[in-house]
Amino acid sequence: MQIFPAIDLKNGQCVRLFQGDFSKKTVVNEDPIAQAKAFATDGATYLHIVDLDGALEGRPINLEIIQRMKKAAKIPVQVGGGIRSMAQVDYYLESGIDRVIIGSAALTNPDFLRAAVQKYGAKIVAGIDAKNGFVATRGWLDVSQVSYLDLAKRMEKVGVETIIYTDISRDGTLTGPNLEQMANLKEHVKVSLIASGGVSSRADLEALAQLGLYGAIAGKALYNHDISMSDIVEVEQIAY
């Protein structure tokens, strides 16, 4: 299972949120470039980067920093946050970013998602962020009446190959991932699934790997030292 250390960017710094709440922000490193390099040095093979400013503004805000992070880390990166037009997708991918994550727009503008997938294939990752099973958009500020499973099925139909599923109620809480919802997704869609939200321990990563998922994202637990990069490297190499 591929495990992605997460770096969330706000005002040029690495931060962690609690349940997606921008008012509950903790700065974990003032230097995101050094953080990206440190993760790679310690064995990370792919980074998950979210431009929180971009998620709020609806346009790329931190691209220059992200490019410098990728250059320092020398490993692939996937980036999300405020990517709502083909011009923005082009902008990121032409600048050397490996994959882009389309979140809110996957629900609000499905034609855009379809066009992006047709143009870029596996370089497009769809993000589903849900609260109590219902999809949230616009930096998690708005909650829709669309269920996470319905949206996943729609995404599969338009050709999406990889979906990141975030349970907002668990994000940044260290309460464990939502294994039930991940298992439900695994049963009903045949895309590569990445779990996000709530990972608190090596045991959580092992439980997700045992579901047969493609990947998992580790954030707060890494910064709190509840999970080490050596844990991540070891779990990635275990065949479940």
From Swiss-Prot:
One of its GO terms (cellular component) is cytoplasm. GO terms for molecular function: 1-(5-phosphoribosyl)-5-[(5-phosphoribosylamino)methylideneamino]imidazole-4-carboxamide isomerase activity. Keywords: Amino-acid biosynthesis, Cytoplasm, Histidine biosynthesis, Isomerase. Pathway: Amino-acid biosynthesis; L-histidine biosynthesis; L-histidine from 5-phospho-alpha-D-ribose 1-diphosphate: step 4/9. Pfam families: His_biosynth (PF00977). InterPro entries: Aldolase_TIM, His_biosynth, HisA_bact_arch, Isoase_HisA-like, Isoase_HisA-like_bact, RibuloseP-bd_barrel. Its EC number is 5.3.1.16. The keyword Cytoplasm applies. It is found in: Cytoplasm. The active site is at D8, D129. It is an enzyme of class 5 (isomerase). GO terms for biological process: L-histidine biosynthetic process; L-tryptophan biosynthetic process. It comes from the Bacteria. Signal peptide: none annotated. It catalyses: 1-(5-phospho-beta-D-ribosyl)-5-[(5-phospho-beta-D-ribosylamino)methylideneamino]imidazole-4-carboxamide = 5-[(5-phospho-1-deoxy-D-ribulos-1-ylimino)methylamino]-1-(5-phospho-beta-D-ribosyl)imidazole-4-carboxamide. Belongs to the HisA/HisF family. HAMAP family: HisA. PANTHER family: 1-(5-PHOSPHORIBOSYL)-5-[(5-PHOSPHORIBOSYLAMINO)METHYLIDENEAMINO] IMIDAZOLE-4-CARBOXAMIDE ISOMERASE. This is 1-(5-phosphoribosyl)-5-[(5-phosphoribosylamino)methylideneamino] imidazole-4-carboxamide isomerase.
